[in-house]
Amino acid sequence: MSNTTVTQKRRTLKVAKSSKTLNVSSGVFRPNQSTTKSINPLFSGKSFGSTGDSKVVDKISAQTPKHTAMVVDENGQDVTPHPLYNPDPGVLQSKQGKVFTALDTSLTTMTEFPSIAFQTTNASLTGPFTRSFFGSASASRISQTAESVTDETKDLLVKQDLSNSISDIQSHREEPKEQLRENILDSTANCYLSETETIWLLDIPAVSVSVESEDAEAVKERNNAYTELCKNRQGNDKYVERSMQTFSDASKTKEVQCDSITMVDKAVMCTVWDMYDSFNNISDVSANTVVSSERHEATIPESSSEGHLVHPKRSNQSLSVVSTVSTVSGSSTHIEKMACVLPLDEEPDLQLILQSDKLKQDLALMERVVLANVFQPKLAAYRQLPIIEDPDCVQMVMEEESWTEQSKNSHCPFLERLWDFSCELTMGRNVSCMVWNKKNPDLLAVGYGQVEFKNPNSGLVCCWSLKNPTWPDRVFHCESGVTALDFSASNANQLAVGMYDGTIAIYNVQTSEQTPITDSSDCANLHTSPVWQLTWIDHEDGLAADKGEILVSVSSDGRISKWIHYKSMECVDLMKLKIHDLQWKRHISSLTPGMCFDFHPNDSKIYLVGTEEGHIHKCSSSYNEQYLESYKAHKRPVYKVTWSPFCSDVFLSCSSDWTIQLWRQDLQIPVMGFTSGQRVVFDIMWSPHCATVFGAVSEGKVEIWDLRVSSLDPTLVNWTSPGVNPTALLFSPETDCVLVGDSEGQVTVYKLKNITAGGGSQGETLEDVIQSTLSSQH
């Protein structure tokens, strides 16, 4: 919108008749072409028929007057309204023919007639959109043709006016757009913007003005005058009180529906300890506040009736005097003053209560009591205790009874799932290692890392308790992925943690401090590759300073080291794993990476170590130059090697070559070989209760082997969920349960069913199986 000044002037409209023709130059046609239009008066409002031929105009001109309705104002200016609809000249047909016959069906309105009738071609026709509308020949032809129109034709045209006027308007065609050229696109288009006047949509006058405004003084004067007027109104004869009658609207009764009012009885229970604590508080207050004036003149001033009494032992507690009683004895003038005081009620600080250690301990104890009730059937099955039936849980009992009946009828070994250790912190993490506390068998430490350690920058250690399977008691965040764990036997609160970056740290599980007691970061001879296993060993040889429990580790840097920590950790190499295979000597390093090790159960100097080249070496801590024995059967890295707890000459090994080997230390070749599929075996472990039973985990399944039953197939196989791989296995030291950690961060507890140890000595049973196997080989 542009800022324009509009002059409102009352115009006088006049209607004048004129037969003048109006020459209009249309922009649709070529330059130097004009159109001659004759505007006829619209006095009858009738409709006339029209075909596509231009000669229809000649017939109509003879019947209608040749006068044009013109509107002029008082100044003589032409203000005649233009027609609302201007048809496109391209719509008209170029064919010449007879028009206005009796069978014409195409109609048009009178308002459209001037525009259509006078768009006739002149004597010269050069092509589409090149007609000339000038000349008198066109006007004379219109006059001669229009006179031949009969009255019947006019009546027919009037009757069809209404139905065809709308269709004629809808026949408007969009004007052709001008074709864009490069010179037009490159030209500069000027756009002019102008500011419009302010449009007020809402204007609320203010009831206050600024002190700095010009009207501030006037407003103050009016306010002061009004204040004085209000003061002088009382008692002034100029003001008379009058009573006015007002109309009270008729009241209407309405009903409202609401909820029914229910009465509830409430009761408060007063327990024995509440009464005991209340009675003790009253007794303490009475004993401390009833004092004698002779014995406590220094502590009770004379003005105590108006002030407060403060007990020496409770100087931080404000007391108020509620009564003072004076008694006079008849036989003496001894006056005793007794004052009864009560402590003032002070609101406790809720924030301090919530942050107190006492509240945390109480909540932890309460949580364990509640979870003991919830997990009672599962914990009882784990500890091999009788299950207490819950009368309110009939459905669960029926399901357990049906499951028990099926298991009794089948007599087949199977794994019964009890529960799993998992929380939000462990979801999506890989369980890399697990270990029991040597003094507290209910405490389990689990190490977490990333799958295949693609992201070694996030490690986690959780200490789980059987008393709370839903949340760990201790959580330690590590800078790198956790690869190895072990509890100390002499100091059960110390947990050694090996990490993927080669760091070894020792944490105190008695506290929740995230800072370790000590670590190997300051040691000059620390590991430079992942630490795959840690073990605390009682070392009795050497000097007095070297005796005691030491920590032994194996790493991918090819070293087996022992760690002694007093103020800091010191490292000494027990063995450097030299490359034994000629194929591995092509590598730059002369040491082969160590993957696992295990010390002999009866001789702490002897230990086995598994390497990445697939060999198992028997070593001694007293001699670090050469291997005592080497066992070569695996073709890929050895992930686990473990001595039998019942037979000290037998050990197991597993590898990524899909096999499990049973060895006897006096033989260079394995006694037995086990495989159940083309899958990598991640972990193995002997059962602590049966000499012939061991467990193994591979990709997608858990296997339990019993050598008494079969040495070809596992006794039972438990398949995991699709996409979940078990990564670690651990037997319970006191019950027939096995724990399985997987790649999703869950540690599932299973109970072994229908697997019992045979009669006689466990070691002899395993020896008999080995001897029978060796006899069959010869």
Swiss-Prot record:
Disruption phenotype: Morpholino knockdown results in ciliopathy-related phenotypes, such as curved bodies, hydrocephalus, abnormal otolith, randomized left-right asymmetry, and pronephric cysts, accompanied with paralyzed pronephric cilia. WD repeats lie at residues 477-517, 526-573, 586-629, 633-673, 676-715, 721-760. GO terms for molecular function: dynein heavy chain binding; dynein light chain binding. PROSITE patterns: WD_REPEATS_2, WD_REPEATS_REGION. It is found in: Cytoplasm, Cytoskeleton, Flagellum axoneme; Cytoplasm, Cytoskeleton, Cilium axoneme; Dynein axonemal particle. It comes from the Eukaryota. InterPro entries: Dynein_IC, WD40/YVTN_repeat-like_dom_sf, WD40_repeat_dom_sf, WD40_rpt. The keyword Transmembrane does not apply. Plays a critical role in the assembly of axonemal dynein complex. Plays a key role in ciliary motility. Part of the multisubunit axonemal dynein complex formed at least of two heavy chains and a number of intermediate and light chains. This is Dynein axonemal intermediate chain 4. It comes from Danio rerio (Zebrafish). The gene is dnai4.
